[in-house]
Amino acid sequence: MTTIVSVRRNGQVVIGGDGQATLGNTVMKGNVKKVRRLYNDKVIAGFAGGTADAFTLFELFERKLEMHQGHLVKAAVELAKDWRTDRMLRKLEALLAVADENASLIITGNGDVIQPENDLIAIGSGGPYAQAAARALLENTDIGARDIVEKALGIAGDICIYTNHNLTIEELSSKA
């Protein structure tokens, strides 16, 4: 698995992820880029789960963004509908964390589109560790979104054997 974290604070939204890819209990690659920019750099997205599955979902999600002129929520709902109802897509095993200047969402293969409390997203095998760390930092410090993401991923990388310290981090200005 992996760890993906998204934090929104003080006019910034940041998504970061580690770079480890495993096959069973063997590390196959340590520098996978699991976070990327989509739709003319107006959306950032990260994935946890199967790499090939996630790349397929990124492509489909970008098409949905194009169809809906970059409207994140509409594109996410349409992707989730297709993911849940299409026989081939249903077999894809991944979670997506996506954000634009207005919203942060989790998209699942069960057809769920979730806007989490406090715009804090943490998915993947190290998600619970990263979420706890990020939440503590959000509630008890004034540090910026990028620093929170970096620290949360660092803690997850120290604890979760499926998460490393090779990070990819993307950020956008936020209205929320």
Curated annotation (Swiss-Prot):
Keyword field: Allosteric enzyme, Cytoplasm, Hydrolase, Metal-binding, Protease, Sodium, Threonine protease
HAMAP family documented for this protein: HslV
CDD domains, sorted: protease_HslV
Gene name, Swiss-Prot/TrEMBL: hslV
Protein name: ATP-dependent protease subunit HslV
Enzyme class: hydrolase
Active-site feature positions: 2
Pfam families: Proteasome (PF00227)
Family: Belongs to the peptidase T1B family. HslV subfamily.
Record lineage: Bacteria, Pseudomonadati, Pseudomonadota, Gammaproteobacteria, Enterobacterales
